[in-house]
């Protein structure tokens, strides 16, 4: 598949994700669901940064492994925050269940597109 088709496909799916989030805000006249997107957008950053700064490929080096583990932990905590925030908002009464569901699905789609883009277009350096 050509790169142009990948970009067009990913951008159309990304537009659907943002549309769901915007609709969850606009239909119910409450803009709190827009805050739910922030953890989903920030979620890939810890893995990208820790992989970039982890330079050693020696499996015996513990420092780089700790850095990668910290990145994975931060990634997991951010994703859990993205799903827990709407639940908290619903329990407090800030948003409705439908708005929380739409914003979670939209945020998940946005996160999926960011992850797929990084997998498809980031060049992996191979050392021999």
Swiss-Prot record:
Residue intervals passing through the bilayer: 7-27, 30-50, 73-95, 99-121
Taxonomy, superkingdom: Eukaryota
Main location: membrane
GO CC terms of this entry: endosome; fungal-type vacuole membrane; Golgi apparatus; Golgi membrane; late endosome; Vps55/Vps68 complex
Biological process terms in GO annotation: late endosome to vacuole transport via multivesicular body sorting pathway; protein transport
Gene designation: vps55
Protein name: Vacuolar protein sorting-associated protein 55
Lumenal-side positions: 28-29, 96-98
Species whose genome carries this gene: Schizosaccharomyces pombe (strain 972 / ATCC 24843)
Keywords, in A-Z order: Endosome, Golgi apparatus, Membrane, Protein transport, Transmembrane, Transmembrane helix, Transport
Record membrane topology: Multi-pass membrane protein
Localization of this protein: Endosome membrane; Golgi apparatus membrane
Family membership noted in the UniProt record: Belongs to the OB-RGRP/VPS55 family.
Side Cytoplasmic, residues: 1-6, 51-72, 122-128
Its biological purpose: Involved in protein transport from endosomes to the vacuole.
Pfam families linked: Vps55 (PF04133)
Protein's UniProt keywords contain Membrane: yes
């Amino acid at each position: 598949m050509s790169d142009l088709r990948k970009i067009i496909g990913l951008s159309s799916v990304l537009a659907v994700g943002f549309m769901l989030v915007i609709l969850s805000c606009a239909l119910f006249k409450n803009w709190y669901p827009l805050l739910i997107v922030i953890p989903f957008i920030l979620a890939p950053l810890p893995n990208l940064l820790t992989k970039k700064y982890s330079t050693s490929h020696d499996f015996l080096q513990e420092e780089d492994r700790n850095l990668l583990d910290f990145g994975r932990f931060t990634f997991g905590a951010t994703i859990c925050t993205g799903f827990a925030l709407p639940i908290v908002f619903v329990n407090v009464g800030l948003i409705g269940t439908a708005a929380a569901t739409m914003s979670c699905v939209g945020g998940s789609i946005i996160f999926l597109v960011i992850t797929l883009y990084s997998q498809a277009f980031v060049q992996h350096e191979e050392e021999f």
